[in-house]
């Protein structure tokens, strides 16, 4: 993907939609809380399943929950407790853009992720 220079919203959306797989990870970064920023010396990190996040924007602002799964194709995450009610009354998960959440607790089961954060 060539670096997007245009400021036209339609071209920004098209670039995100047509982004290659190896660049979609950068679309899944979310800000770290102030405590985590101080601890790990970085502002954001890619969201993975098992992270605890707090929704900052939208109808579900203030909701905190675990990330159930990550939809890399759409660059969205599904957070436990963020759902909408369908017309028949059933609850369905509501995907959230990672830019609208803040990571409050990290899932460090992946040793490679832990090493990357510690700077080794």
UniProtKB/Swiss-Prot annotation:
Gene3D superfamilies attached to this UniProt entry: 2.30.30.30
InterPro entries associated with the record: KOW, Rib_uL2_dom2, Ribosomal_uL24_CS, Ribosomal_uL24_euk/arc, Ribosomal_uL24_KOW, Translation_prot_SH3-like_sf
Keywords, alphabetical: Ribonucleoprotein, Ribosomal protein, RNA-binding, rRNA-binding
GO cellular component: large ribosomal subunit
Region (Disordered): 1-26
Superkingdom in the source lineage: Archaea
Subunit composition and interactions: Part of the 50S ribosomal subunit.
Sequence similarity: Belongs to the universal ribosomal protein uL24 family.
Listed name of the protein: Large ribosomal subunit protein uL24
Organism in which the protein naturally occurs: Methanospirillum hungatei JF-1 (strain ATCC 27890 / DSM 864 / NBRC 100397 / JF-1)
Encoding gene (name): rpl24
């Amino acid at each position: 993907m060539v670096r997007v220079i245009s400021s036209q919203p339609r071209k920004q959306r098209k670039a995100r939609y047509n982004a290659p797989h190896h660049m979609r990870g950068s679309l899944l970064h979310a800000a770290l809380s102030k405590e985590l920023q101080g601890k790990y010396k970085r502002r954001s990190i890619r969201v993975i399943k098992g992270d605890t996040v707090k929704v900052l924007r939208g109808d579900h602002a203030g909701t905190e929950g675990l990330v159930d799964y990550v939809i890399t194709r759409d660059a969205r995450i599904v957070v436990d407790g963020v759902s909408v009610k369908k017309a028949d009354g059933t609850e369905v998960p509501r995907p959230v853009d990672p830019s609208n959440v803040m990571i409050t607790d990290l899932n460090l089961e992946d040793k490679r992720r832990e090493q990357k954060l510690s700077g080794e």
